[in-house]
């Protein structure tokens, strides 16, 4: 028994040493090939590219800091009571039977008129950040990020092949490799710096703003309850916006996509229990190509292409627009 225990301890020690060496290798590669911004922290890069009037949303700032120790337990995404729609070539093509929602009374989708003051919507806002941190760009760029390198990626981050977490990692890589939907641009940002670059390039300006839903003066979740809209304002006059959604991965990765024919709002909400939420809402103004059996149409009782379909975004999503 002692011999077996000693052998197990030796194997664990070797694994820990291998992981430490991998981290050292990544850091050395980053230091040697980081480019002109190699000495900048992600926060400094943000400030160097974006104007001072672009504050960093808490959904991003809480993911800063050293990306190590990373999380080998990437976990399955927990999406609360909202429709589970993954990005893909047919993102709006799922029928209601293919979508997941626990409570049919939840305001997953609503009409744009519901953003008028005094309107009430049943909602559940959950803090669903996975807890994994951003890697600095140099380190992220030194790590393979491709489905063809899956086995190497699993080994680097201590994810057991064949496990549920390995399947999650694989799905994230495959989703990131899917082509953009018609009329959209997309990219998976493996660092904050690459997210900023994609957004500025896609919107054609650095004069942009970023927003996320946040619970005022409160951490964690709020119960599912009725919220009253106390005010709403357009984030921008343009119909373009970029939404960045977190992906399940050993370190922070965001799927960002630019969409046309949309309107973004910032809405002030107050729950029945007094909870205050500053929420971001996105309204899709062209739904003509959506699946007629999509949950939005069944919930709202409307047909594709007739009225804008709106939804609030959860606190882990970042929405970017041009300023003004």
From Swiss-Prot:
Secretion signal, residue range per the UniProt entry: 1-30
Q: What is this protein called?
A: BURP domain-containing protein 5
Please give the organism.
Oryza sativa subsp. japonica
- Tissues expressing this chain: Expressed in panicles.
Membrane-spanning intervals of the chain:
none
Q: Which keywords are on file for this protein?
A: Signal
Keyword presence, Signal: yes
Tell me where in this chain the BURP domain is found. Answer: 109-323
């Amino acid at each position: 028994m002692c011999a077996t225990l000693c052998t197990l301890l030796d194997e664990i020690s070797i694994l820990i040493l291998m992981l430490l060496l991998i981290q050292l290798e990544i850091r050395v590669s980053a230091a040697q090939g980081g480019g002109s911004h190699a000495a900048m922290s992600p926060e400094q890069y943000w400030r160097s590219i974006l104007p001072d009037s672009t504050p960093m949303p808490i959904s991003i700032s809480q993911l800063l800091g050293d990306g190590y120790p990373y999380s080998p337990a990437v976990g399955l995404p927990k999406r609360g009571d909202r429709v589970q729609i993954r990005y893909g070539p047919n993102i709006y093509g799922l029928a209601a039977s293919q979508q997941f929602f626990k409570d049919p009374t939840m305001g997953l989708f609503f009409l744009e008129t519901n953003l008028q003051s005094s309107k009430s919507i049943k909602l559940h806002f959950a803090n669903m950040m996975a807890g994994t941190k951003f890697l600095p760009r140099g380190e992220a760029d030194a790590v393979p990020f491709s489905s063809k390198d899956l086995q190497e990626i699993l080994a680097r981050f201590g994810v057991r092949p064949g496990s549920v977490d390995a399947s999650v990692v694989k799905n994230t890589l495959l989703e990131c490799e899917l082509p953009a939907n018609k009329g959209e641009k997309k990219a998976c940002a493996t660092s904050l710096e690459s997210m900023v670059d994609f957004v500025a390039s896609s919107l054609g300006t650095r004069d942009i703003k970023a927003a996320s839903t946040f619970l005022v003066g409160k951490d964690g979740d709020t119960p599912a309850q009725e919220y009253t809209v106390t005010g709403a304002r357009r984030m921008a006059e343009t119909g373009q916006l970029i939404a960045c959604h977190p992906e399940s991965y050993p370190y922070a990765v965001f799927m960002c996509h630019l969409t046309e024919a949309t309107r973004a709002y910032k809405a002030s909400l107050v729950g029945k229990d007094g909870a205050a939420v500053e929420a971001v809402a996105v309204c899709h103004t062209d739904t003509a190509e959506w699946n007629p059996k999509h949950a939005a149409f069944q919930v709202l009782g409307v047909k594709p292409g007739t009225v804008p379909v709106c939804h609030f975004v959860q606190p882990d999503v970042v929405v970017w627009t041009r300023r003004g």
